[in-house]
């Protein structure tokens, strides 16, 4: 875990991409048949690998994805920001952390390239990753990506960070 946090966070992304490339190289599959899936901080991973190696995946499913990490971690008034500095670093006090996070934060790094198909799932009542993060990420992908990319956003209207709770069930 320590080799993939703070100023080593990019190891998480390169390791994930290397695993997908290994499956292809050894003949187990083809890139267009690989669908990557992750939620919350794993959703950040999904956004980062979509930016870094879009041709390595046929699709990406990002559930309650932490894709606007830099903006969120810069706001100490949010419930989890200060305790998350142990994982990500504190970009308010360390310019190197700020620049490092900016270099991988999915929202900041959307570019004019072809992306795999992307499904982002957010929850209206999520108090950890506010629904606006994936919504603005999807909007930026749609506005910026080149080619004919499918980027979908599903908003769970009665769910939180961990999905639907008992009080919302039918």
Question: What is the predicted function of each stretch?
Answer:
Residues 1-170:
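Active-site-proximal cap/loop segments of hydrolase catalytic domains
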């Amino acid at each position: 875990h320590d080799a993939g946090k703070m100023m080593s966070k990019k190891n998480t992304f390169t390791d994930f991409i290397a695993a997908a490339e290994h499956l292809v190289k050894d003949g187990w599959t083809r890139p267009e048949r690989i669908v990557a899936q992750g939620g919350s901080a794993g959703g950040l991973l999904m956004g980062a690998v979509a930016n870094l190696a879009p041709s390595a995946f046929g699709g990406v499913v990002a559930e309650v994805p932490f894709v606007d990490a830099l903006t969120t971690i810069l706001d100490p008034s949010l419930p989890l920001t200060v305790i998350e500095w142990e994982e990500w670093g504190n970009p308010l006090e360390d310019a190197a952390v700020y620049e490092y996070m900016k270099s991988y934060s999915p929202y900041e790094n959307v570019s004019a390239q072809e992306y795999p198909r992307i499904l982002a799932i957010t929850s209206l009542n999520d108090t950890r990753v506010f629904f606006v993060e994936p919504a603005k990420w999807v909007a930026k992908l749609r506005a910026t990506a080149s080619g004919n990319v499918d980027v979908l956003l599903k908003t769970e209207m009665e769910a939180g960070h961990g999905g639907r709770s008992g009080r919302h069930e039918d």
